[in-house]
UniProtKB/Swiss-Prot annotation:
Coiled coil residues, start to end: 350-420
Record-linked PROSITE patterns: KINESIN_MOTOR_2
Protein name, as recorded: Kinesin-like protein KIN-7H
Taxonomic placement: Eukaryota, Viridiplantae, Streptophyta, Embryophyta, Tracheophyta
Pfam families: DUF3490, Kinesin
Length: 987
């Protein structure tokens, strides 16, 4: 027995309450004989929804559709009502859980008819369960009472003396001297039910011939225990009871034509039902306030069933007749409140005295240990919680300050490095020449594979070997599979500088099997001084080199690594197979050799396709040099890098590649165009002070100033269809633009050093072999996407190259776009029921600064998503839960503003505000009217007035930058350590 007692004590410890809501069902009875001429105004439109069919008045405050756990129509049987609305709750009693089943409704709505059937079906199922579990011993006890005119009577006794109610600390409210019969079998129970039916008070009214004049409560108590010890799970004794409550119906004296005794009975019935409604309504709101259980004997007896230790099911019966519409609405209102009530049902375990003693001993030991070794005190008061939150806020502020300091430090370091580069290169002169062209193509390709930019087949990341590529004087794009190289630029440096390595602060080293690679082209001061001794040479032009590629099987992209702090990338360059003819390989190699010997000589492809591709620029002596722009089937993009501080303009190399040798396209470069460079600008005015592209690549800070110098506010680059445009831009205009950039650059970084000639860029057109059909599809898909996104290729002059469309646009466009987006956001606030305080903060914080673009965009997208979620209404016509929640929160905010007006505004201020908002000073509830008016319209004057008023009521200080950063913390972009890209910084 000791083990059994321990098991019982353990079961006592583990008997935990389970929270659940009251199960509410609605049964709609058919029209009776008295209602034959009346219309039916209620209809069950779904298994869970009942709807009012007639027209609802315009100012009606009640809904037209009601949703519950289950709704039964006039054709539903009592058996169906029991199976779907009460069976699960009724059978909980055999598992040791208390349960109660109510029937609630107006008089003559079918409550007694429903409860009689449910009681019979429950008894049959309980006895069926007992027969299927012979391993447990069941003891059933039955009692019955009625509450007639607030007097408790025993239905199993012929004595009509009212019984007293007693409060027991363990059992709760009990009825003194109540008869409790131990049942022998189900026939015995049926006989007792018949006795109760005969003893109950009934009477005749105008609405019902057999109207119940009292509340009836039938209680069936079941005690079960194991016949022998079968293990831990079946050793305890369980005791639970089920209550079948048939409430008397609410009635109106005018409808029932009651008088005398019937009138007195009706008044007591209505009073007890009113108390029941108060209790249910208070429980539906929570257990914070006082719950008037003791105002009625009915609620006092059923206290445990209403929000206590029991599972509860309520069946609300109603008449569909129009004459009872008001009583039907009251019934549905009661059901709506009841489904929000939460109960805490738990298994009732009975323990022996020894088991109870052991349980109490363990509990005593636990309490003593807590006293001796108290646990660390948690935040139990509001003050402690506030202190903890303040500490967290200070910690976050400290982290934010450290991050801002770190950002400023890095920014200053970058500025110093850029300034150092300006000083280093002010006296340096680097001449450009081509490498030895006498070597064969095969030898050239083999050497270039070790010295050039290359693309790894496994990683797809280009890199540069500084030891070989830079200091041996070649910049070559190479493909490991084809051994085909593109000579791009050659730089000669003295021998003593060829083996020095320089590490860029922006680029981490990439590793290759042959040597360490870095991605910076910056020279140190020592290298610059040595380079200044190199003789100066003028730049020469090398025309198109067409190279035929073989064995091309997969597409390949050159992705240039850019600094982490800039979003500009080398644009994707493509040319279709139709743009360039395909000569034999021998002719191509011969063409390469000839062009390397004589840079001014045209390749055969240029001669044949002169109209489609490029017009050869005239010789160096030509005075009227032109820069010609053409369109072809490919899209070629350029970047104008940031001007060098000494005042130089560099045009990025123009490289045409096939669809399988495409450079990755920057998202910021939306315009694709092609420029054919002129003959070498022999004039020192044109060629002097041109730094390497790679240096300019890392100086993006002065883009905005350069853009403003290139484009006036009213200047908008034109877009011309690429299939129809063929025009020329004179070199004078280009030189004028270059001079403008030179002046801007000199203003930004003045230098007294002599302007030296550096490298100019070359252009080369690459003819590529036709690939397989898969690659053709890839090119077609890309071109289709380009056509859809751009509509037509935008052709710009050299000054437009590489500048993002958002930057190159006129600065005057931002205020217009800002006002348009702000108006859309205000409209979305109105549609999405956005919080008023949030609207006020946002409206006052973001007033049109260009840096606010990201916050405006994120807010617009967030509200658009909320609006889409609002539009997805659930089945049954019920309002979206998100919409209901947002409306509730909005109403709470308005109530808060209503209260704040009393605290924050003086009487004079109130009168001025009322006059400004058009509220009559003689009207009532002026503060309530004002709180309902703010943020209800979308015109800008109303918005400004609303934001100003709310800011004053909530004591919103003048917006500062720190506040804006905290407000937009969720939208801040921060770099990720593992990639050179941006990601969202979550909070």
């Amino acid at each position: 027995m000791g083990a059994a007692e321990e098991e019982a004590a353990a079961a006592w410890d583990k008997a935990e309450a389970k929270e659940e809501r009251i199960m509410v069902s609605v049964r709609l009875r058919p029209l009776n004989g008295r209602e034959a001429g009346d219309s039916c105004d209620w209809e069950c439109i779904s298994p869970t929804t009942v709807m009012f069919r007639s027209t609802v008045p315009e100012r009606a405050m009640f809904p037209t559709a009601y949703t519950y756990d289950r709704v039964f129509g006039p054709d539903s049987s009592t058996r169906q009502v029991y199976e779907e609305g009460a069976k699960e709750v009724a059978l909980s009693v055999v598992s040791g859980i208390n349960s109660s089943i109510f029937a609630y409704g107006q008089t003559s709505s079918g409550k007694t008819y429903t409860m009689t059937g449910i009681t019979e079906y429950s008894v049959l199922d309980i006895y069926d369960y007992i027969e299927k579990h012979p391993e447990r011993e069941f003891i059933l006890r039955f009692s019955a009472i009625e509450i007639y005119n607030e007097a408790v009577r025993d239905l199993l006794s012929h004595d009509t003396t009212p019984l007293r109610l007693l409060d027991d600390p363990e059992k709760g409210t009990t009825v003194e001297k109540l008869t409790e019969e131990t049942l022998r079998d189900k026939d015995h129970l049926r006989n007792l039910l018949a006795v109760c039916e005969a003893q109950r008070q009934i009477g005749e009214t105008a609405l019902n011939e057999t109207s119940s004049r009292s509340h009836q409560i039938l209680r069936l108590t079941i005690e079960s225990s194991t016949r022998q010890y079968l293990g831990r799970g079946n050793s305890s004794t369980l005791v639970a009871c089920v209550n079948f409550v048939d409430l008397a119906g609410s009635e109106r004296a005018s409808q029932t034509a009651s008088a005398g005794v019937r009138l007195k009975e009706g008044s007591h019935i209505n009073r007890s039902l009113l108390t029941l409604g108060k209790v249910v309504r208070q429980l539906s709101k929570g257990r914070n306030g006082h719950i008037p259980y003791r105002d009625s004997k009915l609620t006092r007896i059923l206290q445990s069933s209403l929000g206590g230790n029991a599972r509860t099911a309520i069946i609300c019966t109603m008449s569909p007749a129009r004459s009872h519409i008001e009583q039907s609405r009251n019934t549905l209102l009661f059901a709506t409140c009841a489904k929000e009530v939460v109960t805490n049902a738990q298994v009732n375990v009975v323990m022996s005295d020894k088991a109870l003693v052991k349980h109490l001993q363990r509990e005593l030991e636990r309490l003593q240990s807590e006293i001796k070794f108290p646990a660390p005190a948690s935040c139990t008061t509001h003050a402690e919680a506030l202190r903890e939150k303040d500490a967290q806020i200070k910690k976050l502020e400290k982290q934010l300050k450290e991050l801002m300091e770190e950002r400023d430090t890095v920014k200053s370091q970058l500025d110093c490095l850029l300034k150092s580069d300006c000083d280093d290169h002010s006296d340096g002169r680097v001449a450009k020449r081509w490498d030895e062209h006498s070597r064969s193509s095969e030898s050239f390709a083999r050497n270039a594979s070790e010295e050039a930019f290359s693309v790894s087949d496994t990683s797809g990341v280009p890199y540069q070997d500084q030891d070989n590529a830079v200091f041996n004087g070649s910049y070559v794009f190479s493909d490991d599979r084809d051994d085909i190289v593109f000579p791009v630029q050659t730089v000669d440096l003295p021998e003593e500088t060829k083996h020095e390595k320089f590490m860029s602060p922006w680029h981490p080293p990439s590793h290759h099997s042959s040597s360490d690679c870095i991605e910076s082209y910056h020279m140190t001061e020592a290298a610059s001084r040595t380079a200044s001794e190199v003789s100066e040479e003028h730049c020469r032009e090398v025309q198109c080199i067409d190279i035929h590629e073989h064995r091309r099987s997969t597409s390949h992209k050159f992705d240039l690594l850019l600094p982490q702090d800039t979003e500009f990338q080398t644009p994707e360059l493509e040319i279709s197979k139709e743009a360039v003819p395909q000569p034999d390989e021998d002719q191509e190699l011969e063409s390469i050799t000839n062009r390397m010997e004589d840079p001014t000589r045209m390749c055969p492809v240029e001669e044949e396709q002169q109209d489609e591709i490029v017009d050869t620029c005239e010789s160096n002596g030509t005075t009227d040099n032109d820069v010609k722009l053409y369109t072809c089937d490919s899209n070629i993009s350029f970047d104008i890098q940031k001007p060098y501080p000494n005042g130089c303009l560099t045009v990025k190399r123009c490289i045409l590649s096939s669809k399988d040798r495409a450079l990755s396209r920057s998202k910021s470069c939306r315009a694709s165009f092609m420029i054919i460079p002129n003959s070498w600008f022999d004039d020192s005015e044109y060629t002097s002070q041109t730094p390497p592209n790679e240096i300019l690549k890392h100086t993006p800070r002065r883009f905005d100033k350069v853009r403003r110098s290139l484009y006036p506010e009213n200047d908008n680059p034109s877009s011309v269809d690429r299939s129809e445009f063929s025009g020329e831009v004179s070199s004078d205009e280009v030189v004028k633009d270059m001079s403008t950039i030179d002046e801007v650059a000199k203003d930004m970084c003045p230098s007294d050093a002599e302007q030296e000639t550096l490298t100019s860029d070359i252009s080369c057109l690459t003819k590529l072999k036709k690939t397989d059909s898969d690659h053709e599809d890839e090119l077609d898909e890309y071109q289709d996407q380009q056509s859809i996104r751009d509509g037509s290729t935008t052709l710009r002059t050299v000054k437009d190259v590489g500048i993002d469309s958002s930057l190159s646009a006129s600065p005057s466009r931002w205020p217009i776009d800002f006002e348009k987006m702000r108006q859309e956001i205000i409209q979305l606030w109105h549609e999405c029921n956005a919080p008023i305080v949030h609207r006020t903060y946002f409206f006052l914080l973001f007033k049109g600064d260009p840096a606010d673009n990201i916050y405006m965009e994120v807010e617009h997208r967030r509200l658009s998503f909320i609006r889409r979620s609002f539009s997805a209404s659930p089945a049954g016509g019920e309002l979206n839960s998100a919409v209901v929640s947002s409306l509730k929160n909005l109403r709470r905010e308005r109530d808060m503003l209503y209260k704040q007006m009393l605290k924050k505004l003086t009487n004079g201020e109130k009168e001025r505000v009322y006059a400004r908002w058009g509220i009559d000073l003689s009207s009532k509830q002026r503060r309530l009217q004002l709180s309902r008016l703010v943020w209800t319209q979308t015109d800008m004057e109303h918005i400004r007035e609303s934001a100003s008023l709310v800011a004053k009521l909530i004591e919103l200080l003048e917006p500062a930058q720190a506040l804006k950063e905290m407000f937009g913390l969720n939208f801040t972009l921060a770099p990720r350590s593992e990639r050179r890209s941006f990601g969202l910084l979550g909070t």
